Amino acid sequence: MEIATLDEIVKQSLDFFAGSRPPSLDVSGFSYPFVIGSGNASHTGRIIFSGRAAIIGDESNFKALAEAYKEAIAQKLIRDTVVISASGEKDSVWEIEFAKSLGLKTTLLTCKPESSAAKISDTVYSYKSIAEPYTYNTSTYLGMILSASHENPADIKKFIETVSLPPNFGSYEAYAFVLPDTFQSIAPMVEIKRDELFGPHVMIRANSQGISRHAKFVHPWEHELVISVGNENPYFGHTDHRWFIPLPANAGFGLVECLTYYICGQIQRAKPQYFKEHITGFCTDYGPKAYGKPEKFEVIVPANG
């Protein structure tokens, strides 16, 4: 089975959205909502609602958050729950049901308008996506981010194609991203890609510039490449193993996500193909079993639209 690398999927996603723009999402109509998602869906919610008052949560803490804010719910200070789920299945179904049991209006952002969660949500924003390997979720969440940021996908692709890898890029054992504070929410998305693509085999870490000052670079190492995005880096990592990537003045979350994912895809190309070796076993065996489901996951998630 042909499994595309992450950098390929990034470029394919940008080409797709250049020709099929996602729906425009105006978050100003939500007043202090719960924004719930799993993994990178939660981080996508944080990005979409950046600069606005919102309560960001996930499947692990949604009920605890609802309990903590029960007085605000009772007083109608909180009226909405936004659930973000590419599949519209798994945890998103009970999250919608739970929000409705609290008397909250529910809005679902999904790539599957016929999904179980979509059938019960009050409002559904449906996003198109390309076919891509399970867990990548690049076009899925990128479409949602672009719908709020209104960045130009063609301009993003043009920028990342100007990025030249430093010599011996693939020989490093570890990679560290230092991101502008504005784009802090991208950092955990990068680390989720590390888990999915490499597991314990390759070290990739990502932090904002501010968080990087908190003892993240106590150990300079010639086998770690420190990748500074948007800001020069005079302090962190071995002095001979730093890579600075300037950003265009109008850079948004979509560009920074695509850039970091693109670089992760280049690392994927340079290393043994851990993901390709293991993803089929995960999707057909212990992955769905962990959810108590007999159905297998699709190794290649089909396109929507």
Predicted regions and their residues:
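Cofactor-/ligand-binding subdomain signature composed of acidic, glycine-rich
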Residues: 1-21, 136-137, 279
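A short, well-structured juxtamembrane/interface segment
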Residues: 14-29, 157-171
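Anionic-ligand anchoring segments at beta-strand to alpha-helix junctions in alpha/beta enzyme folds, i.e.
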Residues: 23-78, 169-214
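Glycine-rich phosphate-binding loops that contact phosphosugars or nucleotide phosphates
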Residues: 29-160, 230-246
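Short amphipathic alpha-helical segments and helix-helix/interface helices
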Residues: 93-97, 166, 191
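Internal, active-site/partner-interface "lid" segment
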Residues: 146-172, 276-298
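Internal helical hairpin/lid segments
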Residues: 186-267
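Charge-biased C-terminal accessory regions appended to nucleic-acid-, cytoskeletal NTPase
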Residues: 252-305
